[in-house]
Amino acid sequence: MDRAALLGLSRLCALWAAVLALFPCGAQGNWMWLGIASFGVPEKLGCANLPLNSRQKELCKRKPYLLPSIREGARLGIQECRSQFRHERWNCLVAAASAPGTSPLFGYELSSGTKETAFIYAVMAAGLVHSVTRSCSAGNMTECSCDTTLQNGGSSSEGWHWGGCSDDVQYGMWFSRKFLDFPIKNTTAKESKVLLAMNLHNNEAGRQAVAKLMSLDCRCHGVSGSCAVKTCWKTMSSFEKIGHLLKDKYENSVQISDKIKRKMHRREKDQRKIPIRKDDLLYVNKSPNYCVEDKKLGIPGTQGRECNRTSEGADGCNLLCCGRGYNTHVVRHVERCECKFIWCCYVRCRRCESMTDVHTCK
């Protein structure tokens, strides 16, 4: 390794050291930093230098080949969170990658016990399941591959049998539980117990979303393109589709009591007989006001955010700007257009200008 590479690696290790110093080993969200692209390749740093708690480091040491999947799972979760909420008042803002030790990746929302916390934990757990399962199906790991329970049998009467490579989502879910879930009994404070129980439930809700959207794919076999026999296998849905399901769960999330007796129950007394389903997203505290800046909580507010003047949805100026109104300014765009290939051998284009109205919240 040359001198420049060694210097870069030492600087990266120093950044991770800052993260570990500010956030102790018990913190659940540290691993999420692995999804930030500018942090480099965690495999080169080694398990001991990564922002993981003691249990995760031990698992990392025993299964170092899973590091690329862990990093990809974090990246998937972060990307989908930002995509699903890009037009909302809370837009899943992450901390600056240039200052990795100044705050948790998702800031206040990671520990606030709100609906936003619920979505973060669910989508990150789902991302880990998705990436590990994909890696298994691709043959990148020795201890998992395709789902062996779906390699024989089928329905001869319906003319199909199991074949191909079914995604082994059960292994992905097992690893996600092993890597992310921590026993509640190790926590003493009542408030911490409630939040930890909530986070564990939402982790599982994220995993259930991946399992629920498993689909059946089939390929036909027969003479002259007929479908006399079909070979079928189960595959995971795109992570975007999983993100849409979790966003719907977020919109219909259930508020629970901040007191745990034998089990969690709904906050509203008249609804406590309604059972909590394992795929529900749960939250304890109401969300703060995301309309205005709150430096203490790290909430930037919506001032200066671009909005859609004609939309009635969350991205519309009326909702996104919280009734404060909006400013309009004209943006001039210059681009190449009407390009033609000239023989021989170059491309000639015109410069085209266009004007666009851009609306931003006051």
Curated annotation (Swiss-Prot):
One MF annotation (Gene Ontology) recorded for this entry: cytokine activity
Record's comment on post-translational modification: Palmitoleoylation is required for efficient binding to frizzled receptors. Depalmitoleoylation leads to Wnt signaling pathway inhibition.
PROSITE patterns: WNT1
GO cellular component term of the entry, any: extracellular space
InterPro entries: Wnt, Wnt16, Wnt_C, Wnt_CS
GO biological process: canonical Wnt signaling pathway; cell fate commitment; neuron differentiation
Subcellular location(s) per record: Secreted, Extracellular space, Extracellular matrix
Segment forming the signal sequence: 1-29
Species the sequence originates in: Bos taurus
Similarity section: Belongs to the Wnt family.
A Pfam family matched in the record: wnt
Record keyword Disulfide bond present: yes
Disulfide bonds: 81-92, 136-144, 146-165, 218-232, 220-227, 291-322, 307-317, 321-361, 337-352, 339-349, 344-345
Main location: secreted
Name of the molecule in the record: Protein Wnt-16
SMART domains: WNT1 (SM00097)
Reported function: Ligand for members of the frizzled family of seven transmembrane receptors. Probable developmental protein. May be a signaling molecule which affects the development of discrete regions of tissues. Is likely to signal over only few cell diameters.
Covalently lipidated residues, kind O-palmitoleoyl serine: 224
Residues with attached carbohydrate: 140, 186, 308
Gene: WNT16
UniProt keyword list: Developmental protein, Disulfide bond, Extracellular matrix, Glycoprotein, Lipoprotein, Secreted, Signal, Wnt signaling pathway
Keyword Oxidoreductase attached: no
